[in-house]
């Protein structure tokens, strides 16, 4: 696996509150290797060891870079309010699929059902764009518009997804535990933020970090998005090189 330098600094992580964890009473003992000893708690909360965070975040960046260079597809999941906007922006910048409103149970494990819903969603979007809904009786048009609105909310971020994702990035494993369990069941690799109350053994690769702070979530996503974009550029460059070689 290609290893690169991702410019992850302690000052930036401190400024983004990446190190701030939960109340010491809420911690998961499995997180002990990733947090500072009890004597270094701040106002009754655990503090994440940022040296550990930097190591795992750098590893995650290496992983997504290499995956993107192989043209793998990513799904970013973050349905908590504090994460929704950052997830949307990150997905747009990295050209990834995303879920930032509500995770529908079985979205991945019942993929055939999800595909059916996606086909209906795309069909309704086409009809609306072409003005076909306006030609229908008001009652019928209103029903279809409500259906379209519901599908947009639940499936809008995956409307172009034609197969199961190769990697899933999860912001809060407790909030989106159902999504994580579906990935585990299907064997889809996962990268997850883990706060001091999380289980570090669930995701394929865990990044110890504050998953309740907008600034922390944004910081982690920015690093991962940059790595994904760099990987995609690498893929394009390699593709162009192969074409030039075939020309000679």
Curated annotation (Swiss-Prot):
Its main location: plastid. Keywords: Chloroplast, Plastid, Ribonucleoprotein, Ribosomal protein. Gene3D superfamilies: Glucose-6-phosphate isomerase like protein, domain 1, Helix hairpin bin. GO terms for biological process: translation. The keyword Plastid applies. InterPro entries: Ribosomal_uS2, Ribosomal_uS2_bac/mit/plastid, Ribosomal_uS2_CS, Ribosomal_uS2_flav_dom_sf. The keyword Chloroplast applies. One of its GO terms (cellular component) is chloroplast. GO terms for molecular function: structural constituent of ribosome. This is Small ribosomal subunit protein uS2c. The gene is rps2.
